[in-house]
Amino acid sequence: MTLAASTPPSADGRDERPAGLAPLPEPDAIRFAVVDVETTGLDPAMTRVLESAVVELAADGHPLGEWTSLVSVPGEGELGASWLHGITRSMLSPAPPFRELAGELTAHLAGRVIVGHVLDFDLSHLAAEYARCGLVLPDLRRVGICTRELARSSLPPGPRSLVACCKALGVSCPAAHTALGDARATAAVFAAFLRMGVVPDPRAAAARAAALAWPMSAWDPLGPSCAVPRGSVGRGA
């Protein structure tokens, strides 16, 4: 893996990181969590997460695993741009509410460097959902990397949508506007940027991620998952 240096060592080899930061991890030990959410709208204070996904990557961008679930929301109202995200009320009927997924989602995010395309959008909606459960999501912007921002500095001028970035990098994007499809596409875009050597050295972000205080979770990683992936339900009306 080739990384762009962010905090070079001093002339005598000492690590000139800010005081108090945890020791930097070995590069090969870094793990990335690529996140995406589909929502009922744009304002996290007013709208809800309908689907969430995480793709875990190794330090070199190789996929290690993935997780996704639909999320039930209260009421019988509209679900936003259903024509775009394809989620219907009947699809959500077997899905758990966010409070039942929060522990499982936390287990897939904690300790990782968080990656997303327009990352602030995903993080703001997740923070709002955690808050509705009485939980505080740590400030993941401090341990996050936005692929749209990388595209702005690393690709020729042009659109910076996820689909446009995939096209510019020769990456497949077969399931756009599904949480898992977009997370997979973002992961592939990020892996391409890793190979290009344009990703700022993530070791400091990884050290901060390891030190974050996450909500306590009662979810047992050896127990059954309560996630309901999109592919396990019919679309219905």
Report each predicted region and the residues it spans.
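Short, flexible loop segments at boundaries between secondary-structure elements
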Residues: G144-P156
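Acidic, divalent-metal-coordinating active-site segment for phosphoryl/phosphodiester hydrolysis
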Residues: T178-A192
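Short, intrinsically disordered, low-complexity terminal segments
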Residues: M1-T2, D182
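Active-site flanking residues adjacent to catalytic metal/cofactor-binding acidic residues
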Residues: V35-V37, I145, G181
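Conserved non-catalytic scaffold segment of RNase H-like nuclease domains
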Residues: T2-R141, P156-A176
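Short secondary-structure boundary/hinge segments and terminal tails
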Residues: E100, R148, A183-R184
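Acidic two-metal-ion nuclease catalytic site recognized across multiple nuclease folds
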Residues: T2-L24, A188-A237
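Buried hydrophobic packing segments
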Residues: L126, L150, T186-F190
